Amino acid sequence: MQYTRNTTMTKTDRDTLRSLHGRKKWEHIWAYYKLPIAIVLIVVYILGYAAYRHVTKKEDVLYLGLVNITAGSDLTEQLTTGFAEAQGLTKKQQVDLLSGLLFSESERAEEQYVYASEMKLLGAVSAQRLDVVLMDEYARDRLLADDYFLDLRTLDASFHALSGLNAGGTVLDISDAPFVRQAGFSGKVYLGVVQNAPHPERAAAYIHYLFQR
């Protein structure tokens, strides 16, 4: 037979409680009600955390990836926050940046890091967490060979007139875009939009933003 503890205070217990003061009184209350108190505290914590997450959670309106491209703090600011401000986005909306991806033809490159970068990029595409990719020439050739990019002209008819567009319309040379040119890259920088981009209209707006100045 199982017995459960009676957590209800008797008259004697209540009289004892009235006679106690300060720390001893709280210890007496805790002895009888520690389980209900613990449950209430856990519930309050869960509700508070959920409310905090709801208030502070950011909405990703564009996913941007950098492959074989290292952006300094100024360029990163222009590529992310600058676009958000130009679009008139709220403080809860942001450009999500996936940086540090390395595809290298150098034999000295760390194979594990390159492989991890490739898997990270593939995972982002599979999860539809990538829209726009900025890359160097080597990464461009690698990703073009794997048919990663859509025809940019399907996003906006005006893109037919872009001088840096390749023959297939899938990759755009953005080396002369103001932000990119000011960054002083040694080689050319290219842009592509992945086939299953979750925000194609925003990606088109991003291309306009890069060339607006």
Residue ranges and their predicted role:
Residues 69-73, 138-142, 197-198:
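Solvent-exposed loop/turn segments at secondary-structure junctions
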Residues 1-27:
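N-terminal Lys/Arg-rich, disordered targeting/topogenic segments
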Residues 186-199:
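A bilobed periplasmic-binding-protein/Venus flytrap-type ligand-binding module shared by bacterial periplasmic
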Residues 113-168:
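Extracytoplasmic "Venus flytrap"/periplasmic binding protein-like
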Residues 198-209:
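Short amphipathic alpha-helical coupling segments at ligand-binding clamshell hinges
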Residues 60-70, 95-99:
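Short, well-ordered beta-strand elements
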Residues 78-137:
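Extracytoplasmic/periplasmic/luminal assembly and interaction segments
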Residues 34-53:
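Hydrophobic membrane-insertion alpha-helices, especially the h-region
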